[in-house]
């Protein structure tokens, strides 16, 4: 069988199980922990890549997923990860990061076997320890690779379905509120401010701005380009900012937004000037949107560059201030804006906007619309 065929067989076997068929309680606990460790998804993806390599080539050692190790028992775990797992994970909406585990700081540049006597430096420590123990369980024939892979998929499928059930329940609650008085602009500001105040919310200011163009783009005769991945560097994407805006019917960027979860500094302004100078086409304005306070001296410095940049305006906006002004300016579109923001939040990968953050937003919106 090909690796793709192996994956489909493992999936079918996992889907047919209602409970674990692993008798060993310690192994069962280990795989459950690795699969359900939400703070770091590299462990389960590493485990799946190594198991797939073992199932495809039974002679290899699942603890040797690096060709640099050498010998007939080593293999490229990254090749299995990127060539087969990425598509499989996406097609089946498995709750795992969309990028390979082998490029994470803990797992790249390794040239030795992943044995339990060599600690991997990463957090949580227990995740890597249990992952290595599972690989050793397979290497020492304490459990078959296919049985462990099926159990891994069974847990991931259960997690996916649990997550979907929670989302469906929250969305159903929101639908019951449809037809009632829509939230005021100020209530929406409060709602999104509460969301921005949550942990791990660094992606949200990007969505605050992007939602404005989704809701009002046609009236502005402008559109925002599709967002780049949250962890994509400007040098990789060639983008000017986190949100890039074009005029309708034109692909040239005229406005760029850069989001900051901290104060904007003069160095940030200088970096923007360099990007503006290197841009293939002249833009009209470059706007920083920050969740921190705006330093008046830095704002003045940005304003002073208008003539030096030949008419490109650089300014610093407060994120909540931007939102409040937009909602009052387009008051009739406030519900469209809120729906656009919700859609963007829910469509982001969990690596950018975590599942907890998505559920928090729906809960906050339900509470706001019900008057709780």
Question: Which ranges hold each PLM region?
Answer:
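Interfaces and regulatory segments of ATP-dependent nucleotide/adenylate/phosphodiester-chemistry enzymes
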Residues: 4-188, 328-372
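Short, surface-exposed loop and linker segments with low hydrophobicity and enrichment for Pro/Ser/Thr
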Residues: 22, 27-47, 194-199, 272-284, ...
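A short, highly charged nucleic-acid-interacting micro-segment common to nuclease
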Residues: 38, 43, 190-211, 231-234
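Secondary-structure junction/capping motif
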Residues: 76, 144, 179-187, 200, ...
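Hydrophobic/aromatic-lined pockets within catalytic cores
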Residues: 157, 161, 196, 214-218
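Short N-terminal helix-initiation segments at or just after the protein's N-terminus
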Residues: 181-192, 222-232
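Catalytic core segments in nucleotide and nucleic-acid processing enzymes
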Residues: 203-207, 212-372
